[in-house]
Design a protein with these regions (language model features):
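Single conserved hydrophobic/aromatic residue that forms the stacking wall/gate
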Residues: 1-6, 10
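Conserved catalytic cores of phosphodiester-cleaving nucleases, focusing on short active-site segments
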Residues: 108, 132-149, 163
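Leucine-rich, amphipathic alpha-helical/linker segments
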Residues: 33-89
Length: 198
């Protein structure tokens, strides 16, 4: 599409070299601004997910609005629909449990990075009692996510409580919500979703 070509040109012309490691001949690239970052991530997502019915960038904006408004049930439905729209042949090379888990990690890392263009995002945030899968912060809400592959949403929610992932937000004036999400390796989408206001 024209917007994708425009994003590609913008990215090619705007990525900057942040560091160079001469021993390993490796470059660390960075984005000069959020617009270039958004264009790059949207282009990668469109290629990786190959959604059939909607544009990735539109879905991301809609998802962020739902999170900004505290509409977690609608966000869960949107996430489930998005994952269900990824063509089955995108998952074709997945043969083992480990590969399935890696596939979900990559998929959600990319989705979360896209959301992070619009709100504050912490992926695999290390805390004193463990590493929380994801914390998304908006102006009025803090969402603490724990993901389980072929587990239960209740187990994910219990981990948030047991590891006290919400402790850093005890004095935060925003509404803090713990969300446990279970994904199915069979359906490749959301299986269960449980949340609790903390």
């Amino acid at each position: 599409s024209a917007s994708l070509v425009g994003s590609e040109m913008c990215i090619r012309d705007s990525l900057t070299i942040k560091e160079y490691d001469s021993r390993r001949n490796r470059y660390l690239l960075d984005f000069p601004n959020n617009e270039v970052k958004k264009g790059f991530l949207t282009m990668v997502a469109a290629n990786y997910f190959k959604p059939q019915e909607f544009e990735v960038s539109n879905w991301i904006v809609d998802a962020v609005i739902l999170l900004e408004e505290g509409e977690t049930t609608a966000f869960c439905s949107a996430l489930t629909s998005f994952l269900a729209d990824i063509p089955y042949d995108s998952h074709g090379s997945i043969k083992t449990v480990e590969a399935t888990e890696k596939h979900f990690q990559y998929t959600f890392y990319l989705i979360l990075r896209l959301l992070g263009v619009y709100c504050l995002l912490h992926v695999e945030k290390t805390q004193s009692r463990g590493r929380v899968d994801c914390v998304l912060e908006t102006k009025d809400y803090v969402y603490i996510f724990e993901f389980k592959l072929d587990g239960t949403a209740a187990e994910a929610l219990q981990q948030i409580e047991d590891k006290e992932y919400a402790t850093p937000y005890q004095t935060d004036t925003r509404k803090v919500t713990a969300i446990g999400v279970s994904f199915s390796s069979e359906t490749m989408t959301v299986e269960e979703w449980e949340e609790k206001t903390l």
